[in-house]
């Protein structure tokens, strides 16, 4: 019975990696952050969080891709907790969390870029490290944004 449970437990976790608050190299947005990434054989799931002023709106566009270091683009398949291509108004808390499902990222990719589009206001997060323990660990940087000190786990950002 123990052997069966052990076999079942290991097979359920096979091919799946979870990265809590992944490190990244650059970003052009202070209101959207990736708080978790799950890499499975079926999909790459980003748990994103938007923090801004209550009742302000934002939009996640359906053309968003993850672009690997190889140049390959992984398409956005669906979203949960948010409607794509529509204005979404933040609740009174000023915070909203949702999941974005992308095509599965190839095993060989070490970093990806989150690319919403080519316009300068489109969200971009570059060099997202797909490793639970990145080799080059920089200390967290304190960033002064809109008179608030925020903590970012960015490599060389701020």
Residue ranges and their predicted role:
Residues 77-111, 119:
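Short, solvent-exposed, Trp/other aromatic-anchored flexible loops in extracytoplasmic proteins
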Residues 42-52, 158:
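Short, well-ordered beta-strand segments enriched in hydrophobic/aromatic residues
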């Amino acid at each position: 019975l123990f052997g069966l449970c052990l076999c079942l437990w290991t097979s359920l976790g096979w091919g799946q990696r979870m990265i809590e608050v992944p490190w990244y190299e650059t970003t052009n947005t202070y209101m959207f952050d990736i708080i978790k990434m799950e890499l499975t054989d079926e999909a790459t799931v980003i748990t994103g969080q938007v923090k801004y002023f209550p009742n302000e709106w934002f939009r996640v566009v359906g053309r968003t891709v993850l672009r690997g270091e190889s140049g390959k683009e992984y398409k956005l398949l669906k979203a949960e907790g948010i409607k794509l291509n529509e204005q979404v108004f933040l609740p009174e808390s000023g915070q909203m969390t949702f999941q974005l499902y992308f095509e599965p990222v190839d095993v060989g990719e070490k970093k990806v870029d989150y690319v919403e589009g080519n316009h300068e206001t489109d969200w971009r997060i570059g060099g997202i490290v797909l490793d639970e323990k990145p080799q080059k660990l920089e200390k967290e940087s304190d960033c002064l944004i809109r008179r608030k000190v925020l903590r970012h786990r960015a490599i060389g950002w701020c």
